[in-house]
From Swiss-Prot:
Keyword RNA-binding in record: yes
Gene name linked to the record: rplF
Keywords: Ribonucleoprotein, Ribosomal protein, RNA-binding, rRNA-binding
Name assigned to this protein: Large ribosomal subunit protein uL6
Coiled coil feature spans: none
Quaternary structure and interacting proteins, as annotated: Part of the 50S ribosomal subunit.
Pfam families attached to this UniProt entry: Ribosomal_L6
GO BP terms, alphabetized: cytoplasmic translation
InterPro entries attached to this UniProt entry: Ribosomal_uL6-like, Ribosomal_uL6-like_a/b-dom_sf, Ribosomal_uL6_a/b-dom, Ribosomal_uL6_bac-type, Ribosomal_uL6_CS
GO terms assigned for molecular function: rRNA binding; structural constituent of ribosome
Purpose: This protein binds to the 23S rRNA, and is important in its secondary structure. It is located near the subunit interface in the base of the L7/L12 stalk, and near the tRNA binding site of the peptidyltransferase center.
Keyword set includes Ribosomal protein: yes
Gene Ontology CC, one term: cytosolic large ribosomal subunit
Amino acid sequence: MSRIGYKTVNVPAGVEVKRDGDQVTVKGPKGELTRTFSSVISMKISDGAVDFDRPDNNNKTRALHGTQRANLNNMVEGVVSGFAKTLKLVGVGYRVQAKGKTLILSVGYSNPVEMAIPETLEVKVPDNTTINISGISKQEVGDFAAEVRAVRSPEPYKGKGIRYENEYVRIREGKTGK
């Protein structure tokens, strides 16, 4: 059983954590994040640390305990250093370009796929087969990266598609002829 909920979240200097009812706000050098937290789990904000405590040990409360602690830790980490993901396009003629707040993917379909880049994220295209996604919210960075990857996920026979930078795609053997 995981006991991650009992670990203290360290709050570095220059980061401010505030709770107003169910809303928790974390302000730091890179920006501000707000998230709704359950009032079932009590949160003690002290000098440079935040502790979580649960009233009972039922399954729902135990799950919330660890989740809320992990969410707050990710918020603190995000406003201090941010999060980033890198995607690679593998395949002949697969290209990407960024025009303003639009990402244009040419990945083997008859028309290019256009995706709107969320306002809170920064997307850079250093070359035409690499996409760098960065932002302060771990969830938003991961969700947008997964959305882009889902446009053409890697296929198992040649490995063509959009993949995360360090993702390993297991190549399967094709059918053998008679």
